[in-house]
């Protein structure tokens, strides 16, 4: 009887844990969707609201790690790009979320267009990896790594 009770308790714990993880995945997917809806809308404050102070990134052009200590400065810099006429229309494709407690790794392809102030539009397809952490009841991005997607050779 004790074994049966123990198995029932373990089953309930595992079920609750799996349910919580599924909720976390859905919450993170929703956060990432909002992150890019605000980017497309030119809403710098809304976009940066999904970052933590100290956010770091490797951009698609390569280069050194960029660390942003001030969310206010990051918001102002992005808003300046929007005000200059830059427009971004990205979608996340093949989104995958792996949750590790209060941290998660989000991978996807980032596809879409960038329009520069002179009206020239460039199609982009990048690989994107984000590290997000739980901040109270929200998930926030602490790091992103974006690199150009290169088609696999068929040779």
Regions found by a protein language model. Name each.
Residues 7-16:
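Bacterial N-terminal signal peptides
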Residues 1-5:
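Positively charged n-region of N-terminal signal peptides that target proteins for export
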Residues 17-50, 153-155:
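Short, low-complexity N-terminal intrinsically disordered segments enriched in polar/charged residues
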Residues 102-112:
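A short hydrophobic beta-strand element
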Residues 105, 125-150:
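Short beta-strand edge/turn micro-motifs at domain boundaries
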Residues 25-26, 30, 44-99, 109, ...:
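A solvent-exposed, acidic/Ser-Thr-rich amphipathic alpha-helical stretch
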Residues 112-116, 132:
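Beta-strand elements of well-folded, non-transmembrane domains
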Residues 117-123, 151-155:
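A short acidic/glycine-rich loop-to-helix N-cap element
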């Amino acid at each position: 009887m004790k074994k049966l009770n123990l198995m029932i308790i373990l089953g309930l714990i595992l079920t609750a844990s799996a349910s919580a993880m599924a909720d976390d995945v859905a919450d993170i997917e929703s956060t990432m969707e909002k992150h890019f809806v605000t980017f497309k809308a030119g809403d710098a404050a809304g976009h940066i609201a999904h970052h933590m102070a100290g956010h770091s990134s490797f951009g698609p052009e390569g280069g050194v790690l960029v660390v942003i200590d001030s969310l206010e400065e990051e918001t102002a810099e992005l808003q300046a790009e929007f005000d200059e006429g830059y427009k971004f229309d990205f979608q996340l494709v093949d989104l995958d979320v792996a949750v590790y407690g209060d941290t998660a790794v989000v991978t996807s392809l980032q596809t879409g267009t960038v329009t520069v102030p002179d009206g020239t539009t460039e199609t982009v397809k990048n690989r994107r990896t984000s590290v997000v952490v739980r901040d109270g009841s929200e998930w926030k991005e602490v790091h992103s790594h974006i690199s150009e997607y290169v088609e696999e050779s068929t040779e």
